[in-house]
Amino acid sequence: AKCIEVSQRVRWDIERDVIRGRRFDFDQKFLPDGLSRVPDLAFLRPAEARFLSQIQGRTYANMFALVERFIGAKVIELSRDHGLGDQVAFEALVRLTDEELKHQALFRRLDAMAAAGMPEGYRFVPEPNVVASAVLAKSTWAVLGLVLDIELFSQAHYRSSIAPDPDLSALWKDVFLFHWKEESQHAIVDELEWRRCDATLTAEERERGVDDLIALVADVDGTVQLQARADADYFLRCAGRAFSAAEQDAVHDTLKKAYRWQYIVTGVQEPRFAEVLQALVTPGQLDRIGRALAPIVAHVAS
């Protein structure tokens, strides 16, 4: 009921409340240094560093549009469990789905606005419907674990990196302020649904859910590596000067680290996610998940 009350109070419109007739200021960064890892590339000139943050910001919007495709589909599926039962839960899930559809429209709008001020040749490689179909083929328990991870890291990114950075595009910051307002309620609903799903499982079903969650993390890692390569190639083509082989390798590795950090590590290290996961799985299962994540975490820290 609290989530519904807040949803009603913070509800916003894309054009009226967020965009407000503005355009992106391409003299400013989009993604903050704490997420982009751009300062690790000390050989970049200021304009190049800013451009790389804008590329990452455009991908950040597209990644959220992608994940909200399968989040909305899964949540509307879950709402059927409550349609003739708990009407408060039913309304909360329907509202969440409606907001996720709005967020997809917002992020499509951002991509078009970014395209207007960036060189041609940018590609968002993953196909949202293909990715969503693959995710939704996994067990509901695993999908809900991934969804909670995403909802929590999106909030953490805003609080710790986007909101405090004075050098970001004002429009960019507003986008993620309004996004954060609604995502804060989504995480609460997602956690309740994950716990509800978990309570229905046998030990064998939960073990399969852990297998699926590990597989989903590997799929996410493959997706972000694919986009990191595309974005690094785009940057190197459009930066306006030649880079040494070592510098090109550094750009590729930094983007791979940045995307693993943004879309995997910040989520699994979020205290609330760790707390919920630990409450649902056995120590052995938690260890298996940790071992699957270890190479990714080690690469990000290197």
What are these regions (language model features)?
Residues A1-E91, A112-P128, A134-W141, L201-S302:
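Terminal targeting/low-complexity segments that flank the catalytic cores of oxidoreductases
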Residues R80-L84, D98, K102, R109-A116, ...:
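Alpha-helix capping at helix-to-loop junctions
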Residues F64-G72, L96-D111, L144-Y158, H179-D190, ...:
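Alpha-helical transition-metal enzyme core signature, strongest for iron centers
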Residues S160-Q225:
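Aromatic-anchored, glycine/proline-accented short structural segments
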Residues P128-W180, S184:
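Loop-centered beta-sheet repeat module
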